Amino acid sequence: MAIANVNDLMAQALQEIYDAEHQFLEGQREMDQQATDEDLKSSIQQHISDTEQQIRNLEQVFEQLGQQPQRQTNEVAQGLVSEAQQNMQEAENEAIRDCAIIAAVIKVEHFEMGSYRGLVTGAQQMGQNEIANLLSENMQQEEQTAQIAEQSAPDLFQKAG
């Protein structure tokens, strides 16, 4: 897709984050199946619900722009999901797998926060306040998830010894 102006850039970024959210949703479902720590499972399940809402918010953004929701492959998301899957598979025990999961969650959340910050700024500069609000909602959910993950990581790593 040629990027001739800011609108094109925003459209591409939206398509990429839309794809990323779908990829991460599938990854979260896999993490939920493999996690053993109950608090970790609970936070993953909450984030699955949040991610489903974020996808709906992105669909509203596309609608407000008069576009059909469309996914453009997000290679960063592919890499993060692939790395998480590999680390979960190679973990020698459940506690190590839980550590691999929380580490992956933290990486993903920081990628998403950066993506949404750029999108919010773009929407604000284009005068698209309703769109900026929807994207800000997603960004705030990502920030909350990152905070929860970062707070729970030390306990998981301590359990893994």
Regions found by a protein language model. Give the residues of each.
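Amphipathic alpha-helical hairpins
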Residues: M1-G161
